[in-house]
C-alpha cells in the first residue's frame, strides 16, 4: 500500500503511520518476558516474580517504549520509500480515529528545501588588500615597547627630565593615591581605598577622578564632586553625586625600552639582530593581514550568496541552531567564571536572526559544494594545518595535535570547504579590489 504524503505548506508534510496491534503486542510480551528475568519484587527471588505481576507493573512503560521504537522505525521506512529529505525531528500524534486492529499516528515534519542559487556573475564583492611597510612595523614596535613599559619614581633620572620629586602628575604617569568618597556625608562600599595605583590617561577611572589627580604633587590633596553615570555597574551609586577627596601618595614616570639588541632578544631573536626582528614582525603582520582579509572577504561572499539565493528555511533547523547557540553562550559564560552558567536563563529568541542566517547559509553552501565539487581534499587540509602551525614554536607538535583529534580535523575541513567556496565565487563574481591600511583592516575585521 502506497504511503500518502500530505503537503501542509512550503516545507511541512504529514504522513500516517499504522502499526498492527498484534505486532506491537508480540514485542511488548517479548520485552516483559526479558524484563522478568531480572526484575526484583518484595517476597520473590530475582527472576522468580510471576509474569502476570511483572506485566501489571510494567506494561504501560513497556508499551510506550515499544510504540516509540516502532513509530520511529516505520517513519524511517516511509521516508526512505518516499525519498523524503526530512529536516529536523518529526512530531508524532495519535489519530483521533483508531482502527480496532492497528495503532494510527500522524507524523508531522519538514523537508529540506529546493535551493536556487542565482547567477554568480551578478554577485558583487569588495576585496580589501593591504601592504605591510616600515610604518606598520614601526607602529607595531611602538605597541610592543608600550607593553614592556616600566616606571621610575619621581626624582630618578630618566627621559622625562622629570624635574624631581615635587613634579606634578601628568598623563602617562602611574600614580598611587588614597581616596575617600561620600554621598550625603555617608561613606559607601567601594568609595574608599588606600595605596590605589592607576595610570593617568588610560581611562580606567571616571573622567572627574582623573582630572582631579592631574597636576597634584606628592602629599597634596584635592576634593571634588563626581557624578556616577546612570548605567554605572555599581547600582547603589548609579546616577548619584559623590564628594571625593584624593591624596597623592606616589608619582612614577613611564620608561619604554629602547629598540636595541636586548629588546630584540626579548622578542625571541636570539642573536638580537634588529634586521631579523623587523623581518619577523613584517612576516607576522602579513600573516595577520591575510587572515583578517580572508575573514572580511568570506563574510562579503556569504552575504552575496544569500542575496542571489532563493530558498525556504525549515523552522526545525532554525530552532535546533538556536538551542546550539544558547549552549555556546552558556559555555562562554562558564569559561568567564560566571556561577551556574550552565543553567543561565538565556532566551533562544535572541538568536533567532543569527540562527536563520546560519542555517540558510549552510543550505546554500551545501548545494554549491555539491554542484561544483568543492569538497575539501586531504592535501588542502594538510596545507592549512601546516600554515596554521607555522605561527607556533613547535609546528610539528601542532600538526600532531590536529591529526590526533577528528573533531579538530573536521573543523579544519569545514574551513577549507568555505575557502573553496570563496575562491570559486570570487572567480565568477564582480570583484573590486580596495587598498586599505592595516589599522582600517583590523577595525573592519573586528566589526565583521
Curated annotation (Swiss-Prot):
Its EC number is 5.2.1.8. One of its GO terms (cellular component) is cytoplasm. It holds the Pfam family Trigger_C. InterPro entries: PPIase_dom_sf, PPIase_FKBP_dom, Trig_fac, Trigger_fac_C, Trigger_fac_C_sf, Trigger_fac_ribosome-bd_bac, Trigger_fac_ribosome-bd_sf, Trigger_fact/SurA_dom_sf. Consists of 3 domains; the N-terminus binds the ribosome, the middle domain has PPIase activity, while the C-terminus has intrinsic chaperone activity on its own. Belongs to the FKBP-type PPIase family. Tig subfamily. This is Trigger factor. It comes from Burkholderia vietnamiensis (strain G4 / LMG 22486). The gene is tig.
Amino acid at each position: 500500500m502506497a504511503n500518502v504524503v500530505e503537503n501542509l505548506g512550503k516545507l511541512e508534510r504529514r504522513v500516517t503511520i499504522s502499526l498492527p496491534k498484534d505486532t506491537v503486542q508480540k514485542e511488548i510480551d517479548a520485552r516483559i518476558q526479558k524484563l522478568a528475568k531480572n526484575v526484583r519484587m518484595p517476597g520473590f527471588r530475582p527472576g522468580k516474580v510471576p509474569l502476570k505481576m511483572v506485566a501489571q507493573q510494567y506494561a504501560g512503560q513497556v508499551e510506550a517504549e515499544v510504540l516509540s521504537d516502532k513509530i520511529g522505525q516505520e517513519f524511517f521506512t516511509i521516508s526512505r520509500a518516499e525519498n523524503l529529505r526530512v529536516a529536523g525531528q518529526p512530531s508524532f500524534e495519535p489519530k483521533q480515529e483508531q482502527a480496532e486492529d492497528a495503532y494510527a499516528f500522524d507524523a508531522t515534519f519538514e523537508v529540506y528545501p529546493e535551493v536556487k542559487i542565482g547567477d554568480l556573475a551578478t554577485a558583487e564583492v569588495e576585496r580589501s588588500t593591504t601592504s605591510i611597510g616600515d610604518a606598520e612595523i614601526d607602529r607595531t614596535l611602538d605597541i610592543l615597547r608600550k607593553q614592556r613599559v616600566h616606571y621610575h619614581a619621581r626624582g630618578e633620572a630618566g627621559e622625562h627630565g622629570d624635574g624631581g620629586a615635587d613634579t606634578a602628575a601628568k598623563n602617562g604617569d602611574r600614580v598611587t593615591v588614597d581616596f575617600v568618597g561620600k554621598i550625603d556625608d555617608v561613606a559607601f562600599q567601594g568609595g574608599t581605598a588606600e595605596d590605589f595605583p592607576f595610570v593617568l590617561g588610560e581611562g580606567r577611572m571616571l573622567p572627574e577622578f582623573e582630572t582631579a589627580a592631574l597636576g597634584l604633587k606628592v602629599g597634596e590633596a584635592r576634593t571634588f564632586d563626581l557624578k556616577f553615570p546612570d548605567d554605572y555597574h555599581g547600582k547603589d551609586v548609579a546616577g548619584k553625586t559623590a564628594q571625593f577627596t584624593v591624596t597623592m601618595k606616589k608619582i612614577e614616570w613611564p620608561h619604554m625600552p629602547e629598540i636595541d639588541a636586548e629588546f630584540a632578544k626579548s622578542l625571541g631573536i636570539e642573536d638580537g639582530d634588529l634586521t631579523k626582528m623587523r623581518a619577523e614582525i613584517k612576516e607576522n603582520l602579513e600573516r595577520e593581514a591575510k587572515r583578517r582579509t580572508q575573514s572580511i572577504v568570506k563574510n562579503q561572499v556569504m552575504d552575496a550568496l544569500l542575496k542571489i539565493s532563493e530558498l525556504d528555511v525549515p523552522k526545525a533547523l532554525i530552532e535546533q541552531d538556536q538551542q546550539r547557540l544558547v549552549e555556546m553562550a552558556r559555555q562562554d559564560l562558564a569559561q568567564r567564571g560566571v556561577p551556574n552558567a550552565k543553567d543561565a536563563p538565556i532566551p533562544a529568541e535572541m538568536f533567532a536572526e543569527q540562527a536563520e542566517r546560519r542555517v540558510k547559509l549552510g543550505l546554500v553552501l551545501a548545494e554549491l559544494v555539491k554542484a561544483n565539487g568543492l569538497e575539501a581534499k586531504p592535501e588542502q587540509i594538510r596545507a592549512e594545518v601546516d600554515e596554521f602551525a607555522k605561527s607556533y614554536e613547535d609546528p610539528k607538535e601542532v600538526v600532531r595535535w590536529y591529526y590526533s583529534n577528528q573533531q579538530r580535523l573536521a573543523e579544519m575541513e569545514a574551513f577549507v570547504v568555505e575557502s573553496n567556496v570563496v575562491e570559486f565565487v570570487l572567480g565568477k563574481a564582480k570583484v573590486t579590489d580596495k587598498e586599505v591600511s592595516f589599522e582600517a583592516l583590523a577595525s573592519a575585521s573586528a566589526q565583521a
